[in-house]
Amino acid sequence: VRILVWHGWLLEGSGSNVATARIVEVWRAGGHDVLLVCQERHPERYPWIDAWGVLDRDDVSTIEPNPNASDAPGRCVLLRPEIGTLLPVFVVDHYEGFEDVRPFVDLAEDELETYLRANVEALRAAAAAHRPDVTFVGHGIPGAAIGRRSLGAGSYVAKIHGSDLEYAIRPQARYRTLAREGLEAALAVVGPSAESLRRCVELVPQTTSNARVVPPGVNVATFRPRPRAEALREVADRLEQDESTRNGRPSALDAEVERALDARDAAAIVELFERYDEDVPELEAAARIRRLAHRDGPIVGYLGKLIPQKGVELFLEALPALRHEAAALVVGFGSDRDWLAALALALRRGDREAIAWLRDAGGLPVDPATTPDAAARVSDLTFTGLLDHRYAPGALAAMDVQVVPSILQEAFGMVAAEGAAAGALPIVARHSGLAEVAAALEDDVGRPGLFSFEPGEGAVYRLVDGVDRLLSLPARERDELRHAVSSFVGNHWTWERTAAKLLAAAEAEG
């Protein structure tokens, strides 16, 4: 099958980015011919990309072969549209190659139309060159409207997520109109969970007739239970060979964070973010992870972006109140990295005044009045920076408990599924698509509420109780649960199943 995919961003970092990459990889492995249109700046990092080029309006540059490409029955070519210096996003973060990264809701009308026009022209040119049998476009906006304007009604399958619904379509009527334009004309509309499709239909009722649930998946060959020490040593060994870490955040900045916190100098904390590359592992990540490999006690972890919407502050607040002596592992990247270092310091000190300042000056979603008192025992906290698909499976396999405290309405909760596949027992916020993931795992083991906590006021205490509940289980019972949740993911949530269901959705409506 000749497949065309439009995705507006990168291939790592967010759930939709990772999902796009994994699905295309599976299609290529299955013998399909895929043309992927996205903004990825480093296609050479992906062995499933055979070649790449640039789309400048309707002109395709010379296609360059990827020297790192692996053998496969199919083929994948990546084309990157030239869309200018503005990249609209749902949640602001740093994006290499773009000077102006702004939320969709902050765009002027002419900026939005310029962005849409550039992508419409690019997708139309890509379709003319590839002549696809089926086209998939990402997100309710902007992908669905780009699909309709470039290819016509009934010519594409639209994939919704969670961020498009909550950070563009819900808050602004113009995006509900734009979503309707694209979704009502789609061959099919697929979403990762029944809950995400319900929200979509609530906002855009015209999607009712052709909506289908297609859960995302996990690469169960790499995300699998492993002995902790072995997994961490392998991650450390690989990191020591990764030259990109030399540009990562150095531990020396922690002293500057402390000085800035003591001086209540917000500008100094902001400035630190410009002094390292957030898109790579931190400079001393290998040494930190190797130290963890020698620990005997439990490890409680978080993997995800370091931004307020993901709730990592809630995780840090919970750590001092745990009854169990556990090491904490924070895997991720994002603009709040140095603010989180300051928060961790304030929590260790039990300094509510500093916590209040971090809330007011840094915008951290913390409340000093509800923050648990600092315990005499302080958790060992390890930050690693970004650990991509090469490292994340080992980091997750090392976690006894994985916390997913997202504040954002998540479409599915893929990171929780990946952790479960690796044997990390999840404790997730019980809302949106995260609740569906937790409920499925809880039903499978016959333990309602075991893997979730209620969000909202007082959530930090319920999170503490949830983590302690899992850590209190006998070691043998925890091991049985680890293998149970891993087996469930392998039987129900794999990328092979996801890729097949997407093609089936297109064929059923075609």
Region roles according to the model:
Residues 35-130, 234-238, 254, 259-262, ...:
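A conserved catalytic-core segment of Leloir-type glycosyltransferases
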Residues 187, 377-380, 397-411:
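Acidic donor-binding loop of glycosyltransferase active sites
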Residues 15, 458, 472-506:
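A charged, aromatic-enriched C-terminal amphipathic alpha-helix characteristic of glycosyltransferases
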Residues 40, 195, 217, 229:
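Carbohydrate-associated surface elements
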Residues 269, 273-276, 297, 326, ...:
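Nucleotide-activated donor-binding/catalytic signature segment of Leloir-type glycosyltransferases, i.e.
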Residues 190, 234-310, 316-319, 329-331:
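Conserved donor-binding/catalytic core segment of Leloir-type glycosyltransferases
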Residues 425-435, 439:
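Short hydrophobic beta-strand element within catalytic cores of glycosyltransferases
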